[in-house]
Amino acid sequence: MKTYLVGGAVRDSLLNLPVTEQDWVVVGATPEQLLAQGYQQVGKDFPVFLHPVTHEEYALARTERKSGQGYTGFTCYAAPDVTLEEDLLRRDLTINAIARSSEGELFDPYNGQQDIEKRVLRHVSDAFGEDPLRVLRVARFAARFAHLGFTVASETQSLMAAMAKSGELSALTPERVWKETEKALKTQSPQIYFQVLRDCGALAVLFPEIECLFGVPAPEKWHPEIDTGIHTLMTLAMTAQLSPEVDVRFAALCHDLGKGLTPKEFWPHHHGHGPAGVKLVEQLCQRLRVPNPVRDLAKLVAEYHDLIHTVNKLRPETLLKLFDAIDVWRKPERLEQMIMTSEADARGRTGFEENPYPQGDYLRAAFRIANGVSVQEVVASGLQGLAIRDELKRRRQQALAEWKLTQEVISPLN
């Protein structure tokens, strides 16, 4: 019986990245042998065990054979006669198919180290095409390692395109699609995930609301990049520099979905695209079972992001309506989330990446003024019921009106 460190831990150590978890493969052993040593079995479909002390995962070496549809349609064979090479052969990418022995010796039968040096994501074998989840995994690894210069091998790209065309992606459950997407949104370059999916045809299958933005023009004066799909990915890339939050990044991804509904005769203008996009956000989130808090922010950003661009022109009552709509009184964190997505929208344009976004500070200051009106004083004045709400609104409007007189005019987005 021999144990080997495998997968991400070996890959990340070779890339000089922090290793967060370790997975092991055990060659030449039976479940009974591991159980006798105190390991706890946790895998139902294939034999995976938890180490009695470290609680790290140890899996018996196994092979997999396609026996049905989708990413669950596999028959596993785990036995003492399965070799390390056979176990590594079933893995998705060569960079994930390297093992290290307890003595530190590397086993790399599929040239993963060479692909790490070349910064290439390459599938190990044609069995890659049997698991549709791997299309998403490759896109996620491309996003995760883009800053290191990794790209997808052309032959892997071709195989992913064939998989997208075959209809196999429809076997993926919404939960798995969202889980991979959520992981991708947390990476340093989340826009690469969606670009890789688009390059192989998977974006049209899994995210048609985003796919249809490509080829939709916006006015060149405001959008030198012209294409709304390109602008969407630029906005997501900019958001990744401003916030690590999945909610904010997903909202940025969805902010212009409504432009996909604009009839061609109205191009390149998209009047009312914000409210129109709310329904598409709802549709996308319902299909992928996106968590409610993530969905709620994305809907608000779709509806109000353009309003924030013109915040200094808003009347006091309109500012208060905006604060009410985003529920900032009870959820003050929403203010920063809305500002970050609007800033990313403004800066996610060719030639505007380094521009300041004074609308953010203006909106923060406006909220401080409105929130500074004392609710206790209104209640203490003896008013009852709805009269309290109306008086609070009146005082907030008055405070904002007086404050606005002292503010410099912000030039519009240019």
UniProtKB/Swiss-Prot annotation:
Transferase in keyword set: yes
Q: Which CDD domains match?
A: HDc, NT_ClassII-CCAase
Q: From the UniProt record, list the reaction(s) this protein catalyses.
A: a tRNA precursor + 2 CTP + ATP = a tRNA with a 3' CCA end + 3 diphosphate; a tRNA with a 3' CCA end + 2 CTP + ATP = a tRNA with a 3' CCACCA end + 3 diphosphate
- Give the residues the record marks as binding Mg(2+): E21, D23
Which domain of life does this protein belong to? Bacteria
Positions that bind CTP: G8, R11, R91, R137, R140
Q: Which SUPFAM superfamilies match?
A: Nucleotidyltransferase, Poly A polymerase C-terminal region-like
Instruction: Kindly list the cofactors needed.
Output: Mg(2+); Ni(2+)
EC number annotated for this UniProt entry = 2.7.7.72, 3.1.3.-, 3.1.4.-
Report the residue ranges that make up the HD domain in this protein. 228-329
In which residues is ATP bound? G8, R11, R91, R137, R140
- Record-linked SMART domains: HDc
Matching entries from Pfam families are given as: HD, PolyA_pol, PolyA_pol_RNAbd
Tell me the GO BP annotations in alphabetical order.
RNA repair; tRNA 3'-terminal CCA addition
Q: Name one GO molecular function term.
A: ATP binding
Q: Which InterPro entries match?
A: CCA_bact (IPR012006), HD/PDEase_dom (IPR003607), HD_domain (IPR006674), NT_sf (IPR043519), PolA_pol_head_dom (IPR002646), PolyA_RNA-bd (IPR032828), tRNA_CCA-adding_enzyme (IPR050124)
Alphabetic keyword roster:
ATP-binding, Hydrolase, Magnesium, Metal-binding, Multifunctional enzyme, Nickel, Nucleotide-binding, Nucleotidyltransferase, RNA repair, RNA-binding, Transferase, tRNA processing
Q: Provide the cofactor note recorded for this chain's UniProt entry.
A: Magnesium is required for nucleotidyltransferase activity.
Please state what the annotation says regarding this protein's domains.
Comprises two domains: an N-terminal domain containing the nucleotidyltransferase activity and a C-terminal HD domain associated with both phosphodiesterase and phosphatase activities.
The record describes the protein's role as: Catalyzes the addition and repair of the essential 3'-terminal CCA sequence in tRNAs without using a nucleic acid template. Adds these three nucleotides in the order of C, C, and A to the tRNA nucleotide-73, using CTP and ATP as substrates and producing inorganic pyrophosphate. tRNA 3'-terminal CCA addition is required both for tRNA processing and repair. Also involved in tRNA surveillance by mediating tandem CCA addition to generate a CCACCA at the 3' terminus of unstable tRNAs. While stable tRNAs receive only 3'-terminal CCA, unstable tRNAs are marked with CCACCA and rapidly degraded.
Q: What else is known?
A: A single active site specifically recognizes both ATP and CTP and is responsible for their addition.
Q: Its quaternary structure?
A: Monomer. Can also form homodimers and oligomers.
Family statement: Belongs to the tRNA nucleotidyltransferase/poly(A) polymerase family. Bacterial CCA-adding enzyme type 1 subfamily.
State what protein this is by name. Answer: Multifunctional CCA protein
Q: In which organism is this protein found?
A: Yersinia enterocolitica serotype O:8 / biotype 1B (strain NCTC 13174 / 8081)
Its ancestry begins with: Bacteria, Pseudomonadati, Pseudomonadota, Gammaproteobacteria, Enterobacterales
